């Protein structure tokens, strides 16, 4: 018995076969799209995790900054209490070197502020607030509520700004009497000529103001023969957390004034001392 081999492709059963191309394409598209979707989801997840980590990092950084600011505030408030004249002298001399960096060592030596030029007020243990200014001033050795000569102040208080000077002035006015004026010495709304006339006509016990105006008055009308103390309003910090020595606007004026010929000679002769409040 013989068998005939038939090629399946050659078999014509006269039936039409239709291939579901749409279904095949859909399946194909789903299969090809699936890896992309997974990748996109994974990438999105990574981005979210990265954003969360960055947010946590920023939050930790802000917490550190807040803690640091509180610590600095605490240290600054007590700075002039816990620091000795030697330390404060070094502080001022470092600023002097920084500001007059173009001077030679010999020239800088003429501007050195010695520890003996700084009054040791460690024994005044009360907080350095504006309300305690009158008591602090009365605590200074040799303080009297009597000025001998017009235009010859006994105490000058250097402040970072006119607004701060006004704050210091308010409680300190309690020290004022006929022969001991507490004067506001800043340029805002007051002309230099007006200040000169006022100082020449009055006995200034405490002059409170900004360094530029006080320096002008020192050059124009103050004799400084009886100047006992220059108080730096050092503990106060402005809205930018600057002190009178760290603020660019006030630092150079303060150092220029403290190292001026008149003031340095007074300090060398032990007539005048610097105080940190």
Swiss-Prot record:
Recorded superkingdom: Eukaryota
Source organism of this protein record: Schizosaccharomyces pombe (strain 972 / ATCC 24843) (Fission yeast)
Main subcellular location: nucleus
Region (Disordered): 28-68
Protein name, entry field: Protein cms1
Cysteine disulfide partners in this protein: none
Family under the similarity heading: Belongs to the CMS1 family.
Source organism phylogeny: Eukaryota, Fungi, Dikarya, Ascomycota, Taphrinomycotina
Gene: cms1
GO CC, one annotated term: 90S preribosome
Pfam families given in the database record: CMS1
Any single biological process term in GO: ribosomal small subunit biogenesis
Biased composition (Basic residues): 53-68
């Amino acid at each position: 018995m013989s068998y005939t081999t038939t090629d399946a492709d050659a078999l014509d059963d006269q039936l039409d076969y239709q291939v579901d191309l749409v279904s095949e394409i859909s399946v194909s598209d789903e299969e090809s799209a699936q890896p992309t979707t997974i990748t996109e989801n994974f990438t999105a997840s990574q981005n979210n995790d990265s954003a969360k980590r960055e947010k946590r990092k920023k939050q930790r950084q802000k917490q550190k900054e807040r803690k640091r600011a509180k610590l600095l505030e605490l240290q600054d408030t007590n700075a002039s209490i816990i620091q000795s004249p030697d330390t404060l002298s070094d502080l001022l001399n470092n600023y002097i070197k920084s500001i007059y960096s173009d001077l030679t060592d010999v020239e800088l030596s003429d501007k050195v502020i010695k520890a003996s030029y700084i009054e040791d007020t460690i024994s005044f243990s009360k907080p350095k607030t504006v309300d305690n200014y009158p008591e602090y001033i009365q605590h200074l050795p040799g303080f009297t509520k009597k000025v001998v000569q017009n235009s010859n102040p006994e105490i000058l208080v250097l402040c970072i700004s006119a607004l701060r000077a006004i704050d210091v002035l308010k409680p300190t006015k309690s020290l004022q009497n006929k022969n001991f004026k507490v004067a506001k010495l800043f340029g805002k709304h007051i002309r230099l000529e007006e200040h000169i006339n006022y100082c020449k006509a009055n006995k200034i016990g405490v002059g409170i103001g900004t360094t530029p105006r006080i320096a002008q008055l020192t050059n124009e009308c103050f004799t400084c023969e009886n100047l006992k103390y220059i108080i730096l309003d050092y503990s106060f910090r402005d809205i930018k957390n600057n002190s009178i020595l760290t603020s660019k606007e006030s630092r150079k004026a303060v150092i220029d004034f403290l190292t001026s010929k008149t003031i340095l000679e007074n300090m060398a002769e032990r007539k005048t001392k610097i105080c940190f409040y």
